[in-house]
Amino acid sequence: MGASGFVGQHLLRYLLATTNYSVRAVCRRPEDIQYDAQYADRLQLISADVFDYDAISKGLEGVDVAVYLIHMMADKGDYYDLEAKAAETFGKAARRSGLPRLIYMGGLGNDNDKLSRHLLSRHNTGKILKSYVPLLIEFRASMIVGAGSIAYDIMKNLVHNLPVQTVPSWAVTHTQPIALQDALAYLTESLTVPLEHSEIVEIGGPEELSYKDLIVRYAASIGRKPLVVLVPIVPLWLGAWWLNLFTPRRHAKVGRQMAESLVNPMVVTNDREKSYFRILFLRLLKKRLVMYW
């Protein structure tokens, strides 16, 4: 579910190209999905809104495993309530169809911290989905590095447009971004990884670094050296103004919601990925983030 989004479209193409699975892509606008025609016999496109219980139930009929990639931050209304309602509707449809396994991509963040509304919603969605299916694998990730990722594109646009980066003092908070290809590999392996109970699996790239360092690292990869100035306080309205000026409007709207999460460390704190995805974990250890750009 959510096949027309950034991760959804990449995952769909990845599955078709690297596996022999039959894929059913469910989203509001299947006409937006781009794929190689040679895989058309293994791909079924279904138009369904996540709030349409009957349509989702039909889309889940005969499915062995589903991937849930929905977020509502770009929609009108309170996204926390919308995401909860969407998860409830999908969960009920999954239970009705007898779905045995569900994969969900959520966000990192310690449940014991005072989390942003964005991260609270991500975690709440996982709790709701878990209550409806026999087995939920909830991945928690920070920024996914790849063209089309909203967080990544916002950072890229700011670096390209602003020679001086004014960032708040809490930009020293650490994050652990993961490359798109690695996130896709985790999602793909999770479809068949042997598990008997639900798990929260935190995933990240090989390095922890601050948001300030992330900006500097990306800038260096494109031959730039911006002046990065830490300031004690950057009001949310000022950050929103910058986003509106230098990023696409839809990205800016979502970015304003995500910006609140920058005060929360988004790093891997458990080692479940080592237990269930050992080969992928060891592969990641050999990488450096500079290769991700």
Annotate each predicted stretch with a short phrase.
Residues 8-9, 84, 123:
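Residues forming the Rossmann-fold NAD(P)(H) cofactor-binding site
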Residues 186-256, 265-293:
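Mid/C-terminal beta-alpha module of Rossmann-like enzyme folds, strongest
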